[in-house]
From Swiss-Prot:
Keyword ATP-binding: yes
Lineage, opening ranks: Bacteria, Bacillati, Bacillota, Clostridia, Eubacteriales
Protein name: DNA replication and repair protein RecF
Gene that specifies this protein: recF
Record SUPFAM superfamilies: P-loop containing nucleoside triphosphate hydrolases (SSF52540)
Record localization: Cytoplasm
Amino acid sequence: MYIKNLELINFRNYEILSLKLHSGINVFIGDNAQGKTNILESIYYCSIGKSHRTNKDKELIKWGARDAYISVYISKERLDKKIDIKIFKEGKKGVRVNSIKLKTISDLIGVFNVVMFSPEDLKIVKESPSYRRKFLDIELSKLNKKYYYSLVRYNKVLNERNTILRKWNSNTEVTEVYDHQLSKYGSYIIKERLKYIESLSIRGNKIHKDITSQKENIEFKYITSIKDLNNIQNDFYNLLRENVKKDFEKGSTSFGPHRDDFAVNINNTDTRTFGSQGQQRTAVLTIKLASLEIIKEQTGEYPVLLLDDVLSELDINRQKYILNSIREFQTIITGTGLIDIREYLDDHVKLFKVTNGTVNQ
């Protein structure tokens, strides 16, 4: 899968932009705040229908304009597909695939897969469990519609249960119907996360050993309050019922996939607490490259890889490793100063210069 063309109208600092991209490596170079990341953001938006930088779509619309337009023309499984998205200032958006309007934005997920690695992704390793859960939810939703719908239903039931916990007077029986639903949807979410983490560990350790010249092993472990992983639904339901009084006191649900986490261990040591900045950055790189391989395995095609100003933060050997690893699929790279990647990729590279919302080859 690769992007043939990208068009933007009134998106961020771009009034009009039309680009023909290389099926291999595309490098956008320019000073900070010129619009490099905006290009990657528009591509990411066409993958999951939201930005990786903001929850407010109106921020994507160029100042003074009423709406923004993004279009990507992609080659997928030897078939061409066109995704058109119009973002309106009032908060609405319209999405079409091959001129057919999608009923919901969720129908876009899985049509066009990307994997992005940006400086913000360090939060996956460094920050709170919510960032790791978000990573799992996005990656699994790309691959599994049932997971996405289970997640939506779980969050809806969770919000309803929490409302009851805050507003009712400790009537433990009233939550029982919600507990059945939470355990049903939540058990599926946990099962799929466990399988994904296992795949991530297998692929990730091989990649990480290659990156670190066989000096480090990496392992990912899913952390959940569920004890009986052979009977997750029943164990989860019992956990909810046993703790319902405590939940009424707190006004929130104490256990479930919304509280789960996963550990990132390098050489059996917790990377979040004890890893160096370099180890944490390499761990995220491993996670991203492993997730890319999982998508390839499950869909038959590599996604598009987006690297937003991250190469310059890696040492020369890790830069070379990435550049030697991305020959098989389309990659779009941004940076202010990069090593001469033509030396490593020959004619696989197309270079662009970005200056204040204009792009030149």
